[in-house]
């Protein structure tokens, strides 16, 4: 059975995007690094900011692509090749429009669902056989509003809900790393 060796936090690079809904994946890995007293260092060769942590006695690389969302797959494939990490050993954490704020879901494989970061990762890895931790940001109501919505900051109440979802996901990280997926899915997916 595989173990997770790399966690990707999707988002856009730059201070202007740091607090936007589209960067909740970055928020997630930043919290992991902070909880483990680690900081990210820039790795231009691998197109990312990188930190290394130990989770439940497993060495895990935290990756924030510096390529912007639409080309995240470039960094993911470079880091995976450099560290010899298989797609099944990758966890991608990203924002999810189709899940309410404050909720979080774990998924194995599947399509990109219109998410450009996932689309890029699927293309660069040549597969969609990796784990995804989907952090709900809610939907603005109409597809014409999506781009502005994901690139804007959440309200104070919504930020609190998203932070709660991140904390909830981190509580289950040991089991996710060790591929104990069914119990995690049952707990995360039950209201």
Swiss-Prot record:
Q: Which UniProt keywords apply?
A: Cytoplasm, Hydrolase, RNA-binding, tRNA-binding
One annotated GO molecular function: tRNA binding
For biological process, the GO terms are: protein quality control for misfolded or incompletely synthesized proteins; rescue of stalled ribosome
Query: Where tRNA is bound, by residue?
Result: 17, 68, 70, 116
Site (Discriminates between blocked and unblocked aminoacyl-tRNA): give the residues: 12
Q: Where in the cell is it found?
A: Cytoplasm
* Gene it is expressed from: pth
Site Stabilizes the basic form of H active site to accept a proton: list residues: 95
Quote the protein name from its UniProt record. Answer: Peptidyl-tRNA hydrolase
The record's GO CC annotations read: cytoplasm
Q: Write down the Pfam families for this protein, in alphabetical order.
A: Pept_tRNA_hydro (PF01195)
Q: Which InterPro entries match?
A: Pept_tRNA_hydro, Pept_tRNA_hydro_CS, Pept_tRNA_hydro_sf
Q: Which reaction does it catalyse?
A: an N-acyl-L-alpha-aminoacyl-tRNA + H2O = an N-acyl-L-amino acid + a tRNA + H(+)
* Enzyme Commission number(s): 3.1.1.29
* Enzyme active site: 22 (proton acceptor)
Q: Which family does it belong to?
A: Belongs to the PTH family.
Q: Enzyme class, one word?
A: hydrolase
Major location (coarse): cytoplasm
Q: How does it assemble?
A: Monomer.
Described by its record, this protein's role is as follows: Hydrolyzes ribosome-free peptidyl-tRNAs (with 1 or more amino acids incorporated), which drop off the ribosome during protein synthesis, or as a result of ribosome stalling. Catalyzes the release of premature peptidyl moieties from peptidyl-tRNA molecules trapped in stalled 50S ribosomal subunits, and thus maintains levels of free tRNAs and 50S ribosomes.
């Amino acid at each position: 059975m595989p173990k997770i060796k790399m966690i990707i936090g999707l988002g856009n690079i730059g201070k202007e995007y740091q607090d936007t809904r589209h960067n909740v994946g970055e928020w997630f890995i930043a919290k992991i690094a902070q909880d483990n007293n680690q900081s990210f260092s820039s790795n231009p060769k691998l197109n990312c900011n990188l930190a290394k942590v130990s989770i439940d006695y497993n060495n895990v690389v935290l990756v924030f692509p510096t390529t912007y969302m639409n080309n995240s797959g470039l960094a993911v494939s470079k880091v995976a090749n450099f560290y010899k990490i298989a797609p099944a050993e990758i966890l991608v954490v990203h924002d999810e429009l189709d899940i309410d704020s404050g909720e979080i879901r774990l998924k194995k494989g599947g399509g990109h669902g219109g998410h450009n970061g996932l689309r890029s990762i699927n293309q660069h890895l040549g597969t969609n056989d990796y784990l995804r931790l989907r952090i709900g940001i809610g939907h603005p109501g109409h597809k014409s509003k999506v781009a502005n919505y994901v690139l804007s900051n959440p309200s104070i109440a919504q930020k609190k809900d998203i932070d709660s979802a991140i904390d909830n996901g981190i509580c289950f990280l040991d089991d996710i790393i060790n591929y104990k997926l069914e119990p995690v899915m049952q707990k995360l997916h039950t209201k």
